[in-house]
Design a protein with these regions (language model features):
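Active-site gating loop/helix substructures
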Residues: 1-54, 76, 228
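An amphipathic, hydrophobic-aromatic interaction surface with interspersed Lys/Arg
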Residues: 75-84
Length: 239
């Protein structure tokens, strides 16, 4: 939300100033692009596409998508041509974003990068684990991910069988142990904090200290859970 507030509609991405870089990018052998703040402006919510294109110079194998978009679309004042245009842009961006998310998370893992999504709209609860197990059953999780959780092909097959309910409960408990859910559960943000985080609008209004802290709490917890679920191979054994 804070990043989106920095780049209003119609503006190009902001290039990170040289003084914030640890080394000169022109000296790097693979000539990477200088980092840019792309969440906002003409590239709002479109960043994940470039990162997952095989021939893109931005391509990467592990992608964590922090989605703090919080725009609401209302029919109020749609007779105003400016508001109507803004609502049209917002609706288009929301559809593109959700299509990308559905393709990256809820379709077959074959020939795809590893994605972990952190949307502001998702609640901090065990539903994240239930969603992961559903993705397992539907064949949307990379084998190196479920193998890292010590889940077997037989257990995934059982999720589709006659005893699927029992298998689901067993797998949920196994995943909980694998990601150390007991530790994460103690750090779940309060409902009041979640409500404050979701009430922050994506505009040029300055955020209060409480709003910033609420956004950080929600994003930090959700990121830790999603990375433990979908990118366990990036973590050390002692989490």
């Amino acid at each position: 939300v804070m990043a989106s507030s920095c780049v209003p509609y119609g503006f190009m991405p902001i290039t990170i100033d040289k003084k914030y870089l640890t080394e000169e990018y022109k000296n790097c052998p693979n000539k990477p692009e200088v980092p840019k703040l792309i969440d906002g402006g003409v590239y709002d919510n479109q960043g994940a596409h470039k990162l997952s294109q095989n021939k893109s110079k931005f391509h990467t194998d592990f992608i964590i998508v922090s989605d703090a978009g919080n725009s609401t679309i209302s029919a109020n004042k749609t007779t105003n041509i400016f508001i109507l245009a803004m609502n049209t842009i917002t609706l288009m961006m929301d559809r593109v974003k959700k299509m990308q998310r559905a393709n990256n998370l809820y379709e077959s893992y074959a020939s795809k990068e590893h994605f972990a999504y952190v949307p502001l709209e998702w609640e901090c609860s065990t539903r994240l684990i239930q969603g992961f197990v559903t993705n397992l059953k539907d064949g949307n999780v990379h084998p190196d991910v479920w193998q890292a959780h010590t889940i077997t092909e037989g257990e995934i097959t059982n999720l589709k069988g006659a005893e699927s309910k029992v298998a689901q409960e067993t797998t949920i408990e196994k995943v909980k142990n694998a990601i150390h859910w007991s530790e994460l559960e103690q750090k779940i943000p309060l409902q009041e904090s979640e409500h404050i985080a979701r009430s922050v609008g994506t505009n040029l209004t300055a955020l209060s200290h409480k709003e910033i802290e609420s956004l950080i709490e929600h994003s930090a917890w959700l990121t830790e859970v999603q990375v433990r679920l979908y990118m366990p191979m990036l973590l050390t054994k002692e989490m």
